[in-house]
Design a protein with these regions (language model features):
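FAD-dependent oxidoreductase catalytic-site/capping-region signature
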Residues: 4-157, 165-172
Length: 172
């Protein structure tokens, strides 16, 4: 399948067929930041993703990428297709080099959580009733209050948070 240039400015990556296996760390230990930079609602917040910033996450990434190589290049299922590694390239072998090459293409899997800490300390955003500290009549009712991501899709736990919030708001 080829994406037309007119769609989001996409261009064809190369002139050969291929597949893109991916590695997804579903229990990352790296933590990013979202900071409000002004009181103007039109100013975007400052977002620092901080992907692969811990030793654990770099280890998982390196081992995952090595496993993908092994599956793609050494299993009978794929060997018959004579696969060649396009990126990062077989010349990159050291764990840190593999992670560096992978980090150039690291991105979210669109399930951000944990951006609005619950608690009573100065770094928390909401209390145990999901009310935002210092602001009346505002609650956070989504995955951002989760302390860490679930191993599966975040949809069901987020629905549970919303159901609990509805009960709290209704005084049940």
């Amino acid at each position: 399948m080829c994406i037309r240039d007119s769609i989001l400015g996409a261009t064809k990556l190369h002139d050969f067929d291929g597949i893109t296996p991916t590695v997804a760390n579903i229990r990352p230990t790296s933590r990013g930041e979202i900071n409000i930079v002004s009181n103007n609602i039109k100013d975007y917040p400052k977002i620092k993703m901080n992907y692969l910033s811990t030793d654990d996450d770099r280890y998982v990434a390196a081992q995952g990428l090595k496993l993908v190589r092994k599956i793609m290049l050494e299993t009978e299922t794929f060997k018959k297709y004579e696969p060649e590694e396009y990126r990062p390239g077989l010349h990159i072998k050291d764990d840190e080099e593999v992670v560096k090459a992978g980090s150039d293409h690291t991105q979210t899997i669109f399930h951000p959580v944990g951006t609005c800490k619950m608690g009573k300390d100065e770094n928390s955003v909401v209390d145990d009733k999901l009310k935002v500290h210092g602001i009346e009549n505002l609650r956070v009712v989504d995955a951002s209050i989760m302390p860490s991501i679930t191993s599966g899709n975040t949809n069901a736990p987020t629905i549970m948070i919303a159901e609990k919030a509805a009960d709290m708001i209704l005084g049940k």
